[in-house]
């Protein structure tokens, strides 16, 4: 492994993971969806022990290579740092580790997991932060480019491309993503991997393991002349050139120091060959090790325990629909329950980006902050679509088949008589009846004694699956006359 190979691998991973959040066709996920599932925190929440063990072994073998290659937020910081390097070369300096801050941030994540507020802890989780940045800022640009290409192709009588809607997913997520992006840019532009070594809880855990990695960058004191060039180019600020020491808990194995050393005094070699190197600049005491091990055990135990406007034929004024006041929020099919979603979802926004019907959006409620909730102002949850269950890397939305989805009831339809155009405007309407995919809605005479009286909908809640077709296609504005009330725990019909 050298820095060039590391950069190439990092760019490949970064590009493909980014495309997972940008692609609206589903083609990218078919081939590269596994890249989301090998992210550390999603793998832990999904209890994907194979991936977790694999990442632990990789770290024990090569150090924090995960942070330089697999983690998209790490590569994004390297991109920001590259701009900083263009502004000023040799700008880094060695700094002492901010261990207390690192442990506090890890503790915040653990407490959030224990309390079931996974999305709150996900505010500082690397994969989730990157997902919000990609889906909020990069996806609209990608979609605009696609629409321009589709428009040009159409002018050439080609329909190889199609336009997609670009919609506002919510102000809260935008603000959080913007603050995260700006903070990361400032930190990385000035100081390289500050986030990774002070805030990122994944970096803290892997940093503990990397102290004992088999392969390490080692300083050969017989060749080193103490020029400090390696330290001034270390993005992790972990090389103490005066004492010929490297803090392996913060080293992200970028291997830039090896490229910069003119004396060839730094090698990436097995631990057994490190006899000529100075001791690590940040040796861990037993208290710190116990703290990390303890919090890891608590986290593992808690996770294991937790486990466009529509034309309506002139029936109503054309205006945007408003979200009904649901007593129980709707969660996506496959999420099992509101609790399961809250305890496993990292609010990465991948399911929201992948939803072709635009029914998923980030929640603003503290209990499920930025996690997906189902709403039907822009579309409805088509029975044949299982995209969200296919892309979720954490198990917050379990994989389900199309057949299984048709038997999952995430909620049931409720009719509001005062909002219905039949009652309010004395107009004939049977939109909900005609579009219900399960036949759960029947039309009956408003006046049982007069068969010619206007017909109103009657809902069979035993057949309704809560897809929202009735709510979405209802011509009543601003509130639909029929809406879906959610279930805390999904039911099978």
Task: Briefly describe each language-model feature range.
Residues 1-244, 249-250, 256-493:
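Non-ligating segments of multi-cofactor redox enzymes
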């Amino acid at each position: 492994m050298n820095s060039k190979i590391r950069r190439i691998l990092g760019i490949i991973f970064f590009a493909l993971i980014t495309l997972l959040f940008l692609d609206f066709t589903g083609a990218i996920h078919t081939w590269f969806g596994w890249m989301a599932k090998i992210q550390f925190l999603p793998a832990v929440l999904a209890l994907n022990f194979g991936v977790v063990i694999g990442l632990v072994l990789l770290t024990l073998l090569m150090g924090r290579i995960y942070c330089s290659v697999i983690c998209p937020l790490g590569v994004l910081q390297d991109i920001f740092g590259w701009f900083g390097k263009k502004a000023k070369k040799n700008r880094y300096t060695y700094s002492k580790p901010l261990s207390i801050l690192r442990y506090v941030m890890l503790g915040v994540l653990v407490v959030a997991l224990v309390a079931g507020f996974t999305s709150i802890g996900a505010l500082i989780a690397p994969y989730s932060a990157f997902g919000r940045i990609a889906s909020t800022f990069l996806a609209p640009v990608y979609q605009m480019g696609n629409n321009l290409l589709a428009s040009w192709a159409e002018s050439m009588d080609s329909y190889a491309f199609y336009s997609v809607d670009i919609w506002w997913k919510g102000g809260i997520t935008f603000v959080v993503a913007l603050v995260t992006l700006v903070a990361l840019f400032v930190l990385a532009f000035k100081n390289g991997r500050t986030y990774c070594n002070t805030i990122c809880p994944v970096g803290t855990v892997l940093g503990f393991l990397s102290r004992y990695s088999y392969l390490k960058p080692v300083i050969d004191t017989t060749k080193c002349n103490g020029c400090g060039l390696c330290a001034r180019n270390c993005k992790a600020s972990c090389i103490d050139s005066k004492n010929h020491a490297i803090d392996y808990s913060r080293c992200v194995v970028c291997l830039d120091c090896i490229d910069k050393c003119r004396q060839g005094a730094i090698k990436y070699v097995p631990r057994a060959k490190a006899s000529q190197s100075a001791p690590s600049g940040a040796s861990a005491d037993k208290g710190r090790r116990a703290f990390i091990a303890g919090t890891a055990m608590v986290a593992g135990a808690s996770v294991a325990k937790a486990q466009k406007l529509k034309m309506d034929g002139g029936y109503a004024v054309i205006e945007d629909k408003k979200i009904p006041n649901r007593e129980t929020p709707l969660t996506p099919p496959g999420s099992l329950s509101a609790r399961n979603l809250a305890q496993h979802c990292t609010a990465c926004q991948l399911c929201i980006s992948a939803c072709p019907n635009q029914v998923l959006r980030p929640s603003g409620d503290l209990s499920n902050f930025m996690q997906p909730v189902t709403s039907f102002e822009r579309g409805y949850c088509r029975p044949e679509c299982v995209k969200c269950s296919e892309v979720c890397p954490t198990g917050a939305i379990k994989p389900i088949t199309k057949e299984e989805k048709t038997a999952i009831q995430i909620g049931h339809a409720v009719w509001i008589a005062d909002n219905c155009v039949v009652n309010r405007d004395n107009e004939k309407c049977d939109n909900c009846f005609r579009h219900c995919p399960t036949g759960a809605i029947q039309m009956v005479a408003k006046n049982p004694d007069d068969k010619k009286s206007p017909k109103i909908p009657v809902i069979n809640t035993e057949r309704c699956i809560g897809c929202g077709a009735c709510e979405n296609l209802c011509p009543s504005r601003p509130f639909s006359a029929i809406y879906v009330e959610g279930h805390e725990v999904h039911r099978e019909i």
